[in-house]
Amino acid sequence: MRYVKLHSEYFPEFFNRLKEVGRVYGPVRHNSTYRFEEVNSIDELSLDYTRTILPPKKFFIRPRDAMFKIQKNEVTEVDGDGKFVLFGVHSCDIHGIKILDKVYLSNPPDPYYERRRKNAFIVGISCMPDEYCFCKSLGTDFAMDGFDIFLHELPDGWLVRVGSVKGHEFVWENQDIFDDVTEEDLRNFKEFEEKRAKAFKKSLNKEGLADILDLAFTSKVWKKYAEKCLGCGNCTIVCPTCRCYEVCDTWVRAYEALRMRRYDSCFMPTHGLVAGGHNFRPTRLDRFRHRYYCKNYFDPEAGFNCVGCGRCDEFCPARIEHVKVLDEVREGLI
């Protein structure tokens, strides 16, 4: 992996060069929350954010996504987007995108996702954890791939890791704003990462978790928290790896319809409903437990479906904590 340095005085020009790649989207503050939005100036960015409400998956899998329109006897695909830059993506969210890649880019690849993924230029950025983060315990606190370039803050600029062919091309075409990395830069980078590793307050005990879940299907803990859960589905909407959707046709006008796919949630009562009226998960208990098995049942090939970003904890209106639930399930078997 190649390392270069971006001095602080070149940061505004670096941003302008990114705008030449495509539309730039970055974290923007709204009161106490943050969102990825289109930005035209570095002054609009809040690079010291902890997490956005919606993860970057919304740029690849939209909440409401028009697939094609049907007009009389003709089917026309809805025009796709052009190239864009995701500026300031954290390591956990990059790991979330990598999980989506395994799903949507496996044969046969999803054409809508594939097109947007190819059009994306991802700029990662380092962060400091808060009380909700537990990505370190899942190994998603540091990304080695899945990005084009990654920024690590230094006292006098940024250490830039180059992670893709597109990243190499960008650095090569803009050599005038980059410099070589010094031993002092590498030392500062290492010191920051060591400090960051010690800052995590929450961790998930993943040892033998699949076996624990095998034995805990009837645990009373599921019922305890299912009664507290509102069933709103908020945790699935803000999750970087939840990808369930439904497809529906809507009439635009006479003889013209639009086929859409939109977010669905396993917390919705109709999610498990099939023809004949049977529902695979008819109760809130069934749906609550299912999400934990979906996120935490370790697959040797795919790994976990949770990246430890902390969104489900922070944005849960019932204040249910992901790690606490699993800890209680484990303790109930001892």
Swiss-Prot record:
Record has Oxidoreductase as a keyword: yes
Segments forming domain 4Fe-4S ferredoxin-type: 220-250, 294-328
Cofactor requirements of the protein: [4Fe-4S] cluster
EC number: 1.12.98.4
Broad EC category: oxidoreductase
TM spans (from-to): none
PROSITE patterns to which the protein is assigned, alphabetical: 4FE4S_FER_1 (PS00198), 4FE4S_FER_2 (PS51379)
Any one Pfam family match given in the protein's UniProt record, by short name: Fer4_22
Entry note: cofactor: Binds 2 [4Fe-4S] clusters.
Gene Ontology annotations for the cellular component aspect, listed alphabetically: cytoplasm
GO molecular function per UniProt: 4 iron, 4 sulfur cluster binding; metal ion binding; sulfur reductase activity
Function: Part of a bifunctional enzyme complex that functions as a hydrogen-evolving hydrogenase with sulfur-reducing activity. May play a role in hydrogen cycling during fermentative growth. Activity exhibited with NAD in addition to NADPH. The beta and gamma subunits form the sulfur-reducing component that catalyzes the cytoplasmic production of hydrogen sulfide in the presence of elemental sulfur.
Family matches, as PANTHER family: ANAEROBIC SULFITE REDUCTASE SUBUNIT A
Subunit text: Dimer of heterotetramer of alpha, beta, gamma and delta subunits. The nickel-containing alpha and delta subunits constitute the hydrogenase activity. The beta and gamma subunits (flavin-containing dimer) constitute the sulfur reductase activity.
Name assigned to this protein: Sulfhydrogenase 2 subunit beta
Source species: Pyrococcus furiosus (strain ATCC 43587 / DSM 3638 / JCM 8422 / Vc1)
